A protein has these predicted regions:
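Rossmann-like AdoMet
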Residues: 1-101, 107-133
């Protein structure tokens, strides 16, 4: 991890959430409208460059088919995990839970995207300081 920069895992997660929102066919599993901005990409074109670069890095050590499969499986894992967690938080709020602790928060955008839930919670995001700057 570079000093003063988010972890690669946090950035990749944001890239994947943005790519899912912009490019995957409906219905969307998870809609993170802030992911593109959080990923550090200034445009959809910049996102494409970053996603293609990541896929090419995997392809260099494996093969293009495996790289594409990895991209798809990582996307599926990230967006389904995010959706599941937010669904569970919604149910917890309805049961009266008042705290949400996000360990390894990375570039999470929950508090900004979900004010209808966040307004009922004390949210604690815990991660390496560089990721949260």
């Amino acid at each position: 991890m570079e000093e003063g920069k988010p972890s690669a895992t946090a950035v990749i997660s944001a890239l994947v959430r943005a790519a899912h929102l912009l490019w995957d066919q409906p219905p969307k599993i998870f809609e993170d409208t802030l992911a593109l901005q959080l990923s550090g990409c200034e445009s959809e074109a910049a996102l494409k460059v970053q996603m293609d670069r990541l896929e090419a890095e995997v392809a260099r050590t494996t093969n293009p088919d495996f790289a594409l499969a990895m991209r798809r499986s990582v996307t599926a894992a990230v967006v389904t995990r995010s959706r599941y967690l937010e669904d569970e938080v919604g149910q917890a709020v309805r049961r009266g839970v008042s705290q949400y602790i996000i360990l390894g928060a990375g570039l999470d955008s929950f508090a900004y995207r979900r004010p209808e839930l966040a307004n009922f919670l004390h949210i604690f995001e815990v991660d390496h300081p560089a990721t949260q700057e």
